[in-house]
Amino acid sequence: DFDIVTNCEPGQIRKIFKNSRIIGRRFKLVHITFPDEIVETTTFRSDSKDNEGSIEVNEKGRILRDNSWGTQEEDVKRRDFKINSLYYDPFKGEIIDYFGGIKDLGNKNVTFIGDPEKRILEDPVRILRAIRFAAKLNFSIEKSAKKIILEQKHHLYEISPARIYEEVLKLFLSGHAEMSYKILNEYKVFEILFPHVSDVNKEFEDFFLTAFKETDRRYKVGKKLNPGFIFALLLWPKIFKKSNISKNINFRNFYQSISEVTRKQQVITSVPKRFTSFIKDVWMHQPRFQRTGRKTLRFSNNLRFRAAFDFFLLRHSIEPNLKNDIEWWTEFRTANYDKKIKLLNSRGRKFAKN
Protein backbone atom coordinates (compact mmCIF):
# COMPACT_ATOMS: atom_id res chain seq x y z
CA ASP A 1 0.00 0.00 0.00
CA PHE A 2 1.51 3.34 -1.00
CA ASP A 3 0.64 6.95 -1.78
CA ILE A 4 2.24 9.14 -4.41
CA VAL A 5 3.64 12.44 -3.14
CA THR A 6 5.53 15.17 -5.00
CA ASN A 7 6.94 18.67 -4.60
CA CYS A 8 4.65 19.83 -7.42
CA GLU A 9 1.70 21.89 -6.20
CA PRO A 10 -1.83 20.76 -7.20
CA GLY A 11 -2.10 23.40 -9.91
CA GLN A 12 1.22 22.31 -11.43
CA ILE A 13 0.15 18.66 -11.41
CA ARG A 14 -3.07 19.68 -13.13
CA LYS A 15 -1.10 21.39 -15.92
CA ILE A 16 1.13 18.35 -16.46
CA PHE A 17 -1.74 15.83 -16.49
CA LYS A 18 -4.75 17.04 -18.47
CA ASN A 19 -6.57 13.88 -17.35
CA SER A 20 -6.60 15.08 -13.74
CA ARG A 21 -8.68 17.17 -11.36
CA ILE A 22 -8.08 18.84 -8.01
CA ILE A 23 -10.33 17.63 -5.22
CA GLY A 24 -10.81 18.60 -1.58
CA ARG A 25 -10.72 21.88 0.28
CA ARG A 26 -9.46 20.90 3.73
CA PHE A 27 -6.69 18.82 2.17
CA LYS A 28 -6.21 19.45 -1.54
CA LEU A 29 -4.96 16.60 -3.69
CA VAL A 30 -5.12 15.56 -7.32
CA HIS A 31 -6.83 12.59 -8.95
CA ILE A 32 -5.11 11.55 -12.18
CA THR A 33 -7.51 9.40 -14.18
CA PHE A 34 -6.40 6.49 -16.33
CA PRO A 35 -8.61 3.92 -18.12
CA ASP A 36 -8.24 1.30 -15.39
CA GLU A 37 -7.42 3.32 -12.27
CA ILE A 38 -7.29 6.69 -10.53
CA VAL A 39 -3.90 7.71 -9.15
CA GLU A 40 -4.19 9.92 -6.08
CA THR A 41 -1.32 12.39 -5.83
CA THR A 42 -0.54 14.73 -2.94
CA THR A 43 1.93 17.57 -2.42
CA PHE A 44 4.55 17.70 0.35
CA ARG A 45 3.12 19.60 3.35
CA SER A 46 4.76 21.82 5.95
CA ASP A 47 3.78 23.52 9.21
CA SER A 48 4.46 26.94 7.73
CA LYS A 49 1.70 29.54 7.79
CA ASP A 50 3.60 31.87 5.50
CA ASN A 51 2.76 30.55 2.05
CA GLU A 52 -0.37 31.14 0.05
CA GLY A 53 -2.08 27.84 0.82
CA SER A 54 -1.49 28.11 4.57
CA ILE A 55 -2.53 25.84 7.39
CA GLU A 56 -5.56 26.66 9.52
CA VAL A 57 -5.81 25.40 13.10
CA ASN A 58 -8.60 26.03 15.63
CA GLU A 59 -8.22 26.84 19.32
CA LYS A 60 -8.07 23.12 20.24
CA GLY A 61 -5.22 22.45 17.82
CA ARG A 62 -7.49 20.80 15.23
CA ILE A 63 -6.25 21.15 11.68
CA LEU A 64 -9.11 22.70 9.71
CA ARG A 65 -7.24 23.29 6.48
CA ASP A 66 -3.89 21.85 5.45
CA ASN A 67 -2.65 23.26 2.17
CA SER A 68 0.74 24.60 3.19
CA TRP A 69 3.29 23.22 0.74
CA GLY A 70 6.76 22.20 1.85
CA THR A 71 9.68 19.82 1.38
CA GLN A 72 9.96 16.08 1.92
CA GLU A 73 11.79 16.71 5.20
CA GLU A 74 8.94 18.94 6.38
CA ASP A 75 6.27 16.60 5.06
CA VAL A 76 7.49 13.57 7.00
CA LYS A 77 6.99 15.44 10.28
CA ARG A 78 3.32 15.83 9.40
CA ARG A 79 2.75 12.09 9.11
CA ASP A 80 0.79 10.41 11.89
CA PHE A 81 2.65 7.13 12.53
CA LYS A 82 6.22 5.98 12.04
CA ILE A 83 5.12 3.03 9.90
CA ASN A 84 3.27 5.53 7.73
CA SER A 85 6.29 7.78 7.22
CA LEU A 86 8.41 5.64 4.90
CA TYR A 87 9.27 7.11 1.49
CA TYR A 88 10.38 5.13 -1.54
CA ASP A 89 12.48 6.75 -4.24
CA PRO A 90 11.50 4.88 -7.45
CA PHE A 91 14.51 6.27 -9.34
CA LYS A 92 17.13 5.18 -6.79
CA GLY A 93 15.19 2.15 -5.56
CA GLU A 94 15.70 3.30 -1.97
CA ILE A 95 13.46 3.39 1.11
CA ILE A 96 13.91 6.61 3.06
CA ASP A 97 13.21 6.15 6.78
CA TYR A 98 13.29 9.31 8.91
CA PHE A 99 11.71 8.07 12.15
CA GLY A 100 12.43 4.35 12.47
CA GLY A 101 9.38 3.11 10.62
CA ILE A 102 11.17 -0.04 9.47
CA LYS A 103 12.04 -0.86 13.08
CA ASP A 104 8.39 -0.43 14.08
CA LEU A 105 7.36 -2.74 11.25
CA GLY A 106 9.75 -5.36 12.58
CA ASN A 107 8.51 -4.92 16.15
CA LYS A 108 4.86 -4.77 15.03
CA ASN A 109 4.24 -1.42 16.67
CA VAL A 110 2.00 1.51 15.79
CA THR A 111 3.84 4.54 17.18
CA PHE A 112 2.83 8.18 16.79
CA ILE A 113 5.34 10.66 15.40
CA GLY A 114 5.82 13.27 18.10
CA ASP A 115 3.41 13.84 20.98
CA PRO A 116 0.40 11.48 20.64
CA GLU A 117 -1.94 13.95 22.35
CA LYS A 118 -0.99 16.76 19.97
CA ARG A 119 -1.33 14.49 16.94
CA ILE A 120 -4.76 13.28 18.07
CA LEU A 121 -5.98 16.82 18.78
CA GLU A 122 -4.82 17.84 15.30
CA ASP A 123 -7.07 15.15 13.85
CA PRO A 124 -9.05 12.82 16.17
CA VAL A 125 -9.61 10.41 13.27
CA ARG A 126 -6.02 9.31 13.91
CA ILE A 127 -7.49 7.28 16.79
CA LEU A 128 -9.45 5.23 14.28
CA ARG A 129 -6.47 5.02 11.94
CA ALA A 130 -4.27 3.67 14.76
CA ILE A 131 -6.89 1.04 15.60
CA ARG A 132 -7.29 0.13 11.93
CA PHE A 133 -3.54 -0.34 11.43
CA ALA A 134 -3.33 -2.44 14.60
CA ALA A 135 -6.28 -4.60 13.52
CA LYS A 136 -5.19 -4.99 9.91
CA LEU A 137 -1.53 -5.76 10.60
CA ASN A 138 -1.93 -7.46 13.99
CA PHE A 139 0.26 -4.74 15.52
CA SER A 140 0.18 -3.15 18.98
CA ILE A 141 -0.49 0.53 19.60
CA GLU A 142 2.21 2.14 21.73
CA LYS A 143 1.35 1.91 25.44
CA SER A 144 1.79 5.64 26.07
CA ALA A 145 -0.99 6.38 23.57
CA LYS A 146 -3.67 4.24 25.24
CA LYS A 147 -4.30 6.63 28.13
CA ILE A 148 -4.42 9.56 25.71
CA ILE A 149 -6.87 7.77 23.40
CA LEU A 150 -9.13 7.01 26.37
CA GLU A 151 -9.00 10.67 27.39
CA GLN A 152 -9.39 12.19 23.93
CA LYS A 153 -11.76 9.76 22.18
CA HIS A 154 -14.76 12.07 22.77
CA HIS A 155 -13.27 14.46 20.19
CA LEU A 156 -14.45 12.03 17.52
CA TYR A 157 -17.92 13.53 18.07
CA GLU A 158 -16.55 16.72 16.51
CA ILE A 159 -15.71 15.00 13.22
CA SER A 160 -18.21 15.12 10.38
CA PRO A 161 -20.60 12.11 10.27
CA ALA A 162 -19.68 11.54 6.61
CA ARG A 163 -16.00 11.13 7.49
CA ILE A 164 -16.74 8.84 10.44
CA TYR A 165 -18.92 6.70 8.16
CA GLU A 166 -16.00 6.21 5.75
CA GLU A 167 -13.69 5.25 8.61
CA VAL A 168 -16.20 2.70 9.93
CA LEU A 169 -16.28 1.06 6.50
CA LYS A 170 -12.48 0.79 6.51
CA LEU A 171 -12.59 -0.84 9.94
CA PHE A 172 -15.24 -3.43 9.13
CA LEU A 173 -15.08 -4.06 5.38
CA SER A 174 -11.36 -4.70 4.85
CA GLY A 175 -10.94 -8.23 6.16
CA HIS A 176 -10.24 -7.41 9.82
CA ALA A 177 -13.71 -6.68 11.21
CA GLU A 178 -13.39 -9.10 14.14
CA MET A 179 -10.08 -7.63 15.32
CA SER A 180 -11.33 -4.07 14.74
CA TYR A 181 -14.31 -4.79 16.97
CA LYS A 182 -12.08 -6.17 19.73
CA ILE A 183 -9.66 -3.23 19.67
CA LEU A 184 -12.46 -0.66 19.46
CA ASN A 185 -13.84 -2.17 22.66
CA GLU A 186 -10.42 -2.35 24.31
CA TYR A 187 -9.97 1.39 23.76
CA LYS A 188 -13.65 2.12 24.51
CA VAL A 189 -14.11 3.71 21.10
CA PHE A 190 -16.95 1.41 20.01
CA GLU A 191 -19.22 3.29 22.42
CA ILE A 192 -18.30 6.55 20.67
CA LEU A 193 -19.11 5.22 17.21
CA PHE A 194 -22.28 3.40 18.29
CA PRO A 195 -23.44 5.08 21.50
CA HIS A 196 -27.00 3.78 21.22
CA VAL A 197 -25.75 0.17 21.21
CA SER A 198 -23.09 0.51 23.90
CA ASP A 199 -25.44 -0.44 26.76
CA VAL A 200 -26.12 -3.87 25.18
CA ASN A 201 -22.74 -4.35 23.47
CA LYS A 202 -21.40 -6.86 26.00
CA GLU A 203 -24.60 -8.89 25.93
CA PHE A 204 -24.37 -9.25 22.14
CA GLU A 205 -20.62 -9.88 21.94
CA ASP A 206 -21.09 -13.45 20.64
CA PHE A 207 -23.41 -12.16 17.92
CA PHE A 208 -20.88 -9.54 16.82
CA LEU A 209 -17.92 -11.92 16.86
CA THR A 210 -19.81 -14.55 14.86
CA ALA A 211 -20.98 -11.95 12.36
CA PHE A 212 -17.55 -10.36 11.92
CA LYS A 213 -15.81 -13.71 11.50
CA GLU A 214 -18.21 -14.43 8.66
CA THR A 215 -17.64 -10.94 7.23
CA ASP A 216 -13.87 -11.48 7.24
CA ARG A 217 -14.31 -14.90 5.63
CA ARG A 218 -16.38 -13.42 2.81
CA TYR A 219 -13.77 -10.71 2.26
CA LYS A 220 -10.94 -13.24 2.05
CA VAL A 221 -12.72 -15.29 -0.64
CA GLY A 222 -13.51 -12.18 -2.67
CA LYS A 223 -17.24 -11.95 -1.99
CA LYS A 224 -18.92 -8.57 -2.18
CA LEU A 225 -19.63 -6.83 1.14
CA ASN A 226 -22.51 -4.40 1.51
CA PRO A 227 -22.02 -1.42 3.87
CA GLY A 228 -25.71 -1.59 4.71
CA PHE A 229 -25.34 -5.16 5.94
CA ILE A 230 -22.54 -4.17 8.33
CA PHE A 231 -24.59 -1.35 9.81
CA ALA A 232 -27.60 -3.67 10.07
CA LEU A 233 -25.40 -5.99 12.16
CA LEU A 234 -23.93 -3.22 14.29
CA LEU A 235 -27.29 -1.69 15.17
CA TRP A 236 -29.39 -4.85 15.42
CA PRO A 237 -28.97 -5.36 19.21
CA LYS A 238 -30.93 -2.17 19.87
CA ILE A 239 -33.72 -3.25 17.52
CA PHE A 240 -33.79 -6.68 19.15
CA LYS A 241 -34.02 -5.23 22.67
CA LYS A 242 -36.68 -2.67 21.77
CA SER A 243 -38.91 -5.11 19.85
CA ASN A 244 -40.27 -8.57 20.49
CA ILE A 245 -39.09 -10.32 17.31
CA SER A 246 -41.44 -13.29 17.32
CA LYS A 247 -44.61 -14.62 15.74
CA ASN A 248 -46.59 -12.23 17.93
CA ILE A 249 -44.54 -9.16 17.08
CA ASN A 250 -46.09 -5.71 17.42
CA PHE A 251 -45.25 -4.35 13.97
CA ARG A 252 -46.07 -0.77 14.86
CA ASN A 253 -43.51 -0.76 17.67
CA PHE A 254 -41.07 -2.64 15.45
CA TYR A 255 -41.22 -0.04 12.67
CA GLN A 256 -40.95 2.80 15.18
CA SER A 257 -37.82 1.22 16.66
CA ILE A 258 -36.26 0.89 13.21
CA SER A 259 -36.89 4.55 12.40
CA GLU A 260 -35.61 5.72 15.78
CA VAL A 261 -32.39 3.68 15.76
CA THR A 262 -31.41 4.63 12.19
CA ARG A 263 -32.24 8.30 12.78
CA LYS A 264 -30.09 8.52 15.92
CA GLN A 265 -27.13 6.76 14.29
CA GLN A 266 -27.14 9.23 11.39
CA VAL A 267 -25.91 11.91 13.80
CA ILE A 268 -22.70 9.89 14.27
CA THR A 269 -22.28 8.18 10.89
CA SER A 270 -23.95 9.66 7.85
CA VAL A 271 -25.05 6.46 6.11
CA PRO A 272 -26.17 7.13 2.49
CA LYS A 273 -29.89 6.74 1.85
CA ARG A 274 -29.47 3.73 -0.44
CA PHE A 275 -27.87 1.83 2.43
CA THR A 276 -30.35 2.96 5.11
CA SER A 277 -33.08 1.56 2.85
CA PHE A 278 -31.16 -1.71 2.64
CA ILE A 279 -30.75 -1.81 6.44
CA LYS A 280 -34.46 -1.29 7.01
CA ASP A 281 -35.40 -3.94 4.44
CA VAL A 282 -33.13 -6.54 6.05
CA TRP A 283 -34.57 -5.80 9.48
CA MET A 284 -38.21 -5.65 8.40
CA HIS A 285 -37.92 -9.04 6.73
CA GLN A 286 -36.74 -10.77 9.92
CA PRO A 287 -40.21 -11.48 11.41
CA ARG A 288 -41.24 -13.14 8.14
CA PHE A 289 -38.87 -16.03 8.77
CA GLN A 290 -41.01 -16.99 11.76
CA ARG A 291 -44.38 -16.37 10.07
CA THR A 292 -44.91 -18.62 7.06
CA GLY A 293 -48.08 -18.19 5.05
CA ARG A 294 -49.51 -17.35 1.66
CA LYS A 295 -46.87 -14.70 1.01
CA THR A 296 -43.92 -16.98 1.77
CA LEU A 297 -43.35 -18.04 -1.83
CA ARG A 298 -43.34 -14.45 -3.02
CA PHE A 299 -41.08 -13.44 -0.15
CA SER A 300 -38.51 -16.07 -1.13
CA ASN A 301 -38.19 -14.33 -4.51
CA ASN A 302 -37.76 -10.88 -2.98
CA LEU A 303 -34.68 -8.89 -4.05
CA ARG A 304 -33.53 -8.63 -0.41
CA PHE A 305 -34.35 -12.21 0.54
CA ARG A 306 -30.79 -13.58 0.39
CA ALA A 307 -29.35 -10.75 2.49
CA ALA A 308 -32.20 -11.06 4.99
CA PHE A 309 -31.71 -14.84 5.17
CA ASP A 310 -27.94 -14.48 5.75
CA PHE A 311 -28.76 -12.06 8.56
CA PHE A 312 -31.30 -14.51 9.99
CA LEU A 313 -28.62 -17.24 10.08
CA LEU A 314 -26.30 -14.98 12.08
CA ARG A 315 -28.99 -14.35 14.68
CA HIS A 316 -28.81 -18.01 15.73
CA SER A 317 -25.65 -17.30 17.77
CA ILE A 318 -27.78 -15.46 20.35
CA GLU A 319 -31.20 -16.94 19.56
CA PRO A 320 -30.89 -20.75 19.74
CA ASN A 321 -34.69 -20.98 19.55
CA LEU A 322 -34.40 -20.17 15.83
CA LYS A 323 -32.83 -23.56 15.08
CA ASN A 324 -35.98 -25.21 13.69
CA ASP A 325 -36.89 -22.16 11.59
CA ILE A 326 -33.36 -21.99 10.18
CA GLU A 327 -33.41 -25.67 9.23
CA TRP A 328 -36.83 -25.28 7.57
CA TRP A 329 -35.81 -22.18 5.60
CA THR A 330 -32.49 -23.72 4.58
CA GLU A 331 -34.37 -26.60 2.99
CA PHE A 332 -37.12 -24.37 1.58
CA ARG A 333 -34.71 -21.93 -0.04
CA THR A 334 -33.15 -24.52 -2.36
CA ALA A 335 -36.24 -26.69 -2.95
CA ASN A 336 -38.19 -26.90 -6.21
CA TYR A 337 -41.76 -25.64 -6.37
CA ASP A 338 -43.45 -28.95 -5.47
CA LYS A 339 -41.13 -29.46 -2.51
CA LYS A 340 -41.81 -25.91 -1.31
CA ILE A 341 -45.56 -26.60 -1.32
CA LYS A 342 -44.99 -29.76 0.75
CA LEU A 343 -42.85 -27.83 3.22
CA LEU A 344 -45.50 -25.13 3.56
CA ASN A 345 -48.18 -27.79 4.09
CA SER A 346 -45.99 -29.35 6.79
CA ARG A 347 -46.37 -26.14 8.73
CA GLY A 348 -50.13 -26.36 8.64
CA ARG A 349 -50.56 -24.19 5.56
CA LYS A 350 -52.70 -25.95 2.99
CA PHE A 351 -51.55 -25.03 -0.49
CA ALA A 352 -52.68 -26.70 -3.68
CA LYS A 353 -50.21 -27.33 -6.49
CA ASN A 354 -50.71 -25.33 -9.67
Feature annotation, model-predicted:
Residues 1-354:
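Catalytic cores of the polymerase beta-like nucleotidyltransferase superfamily
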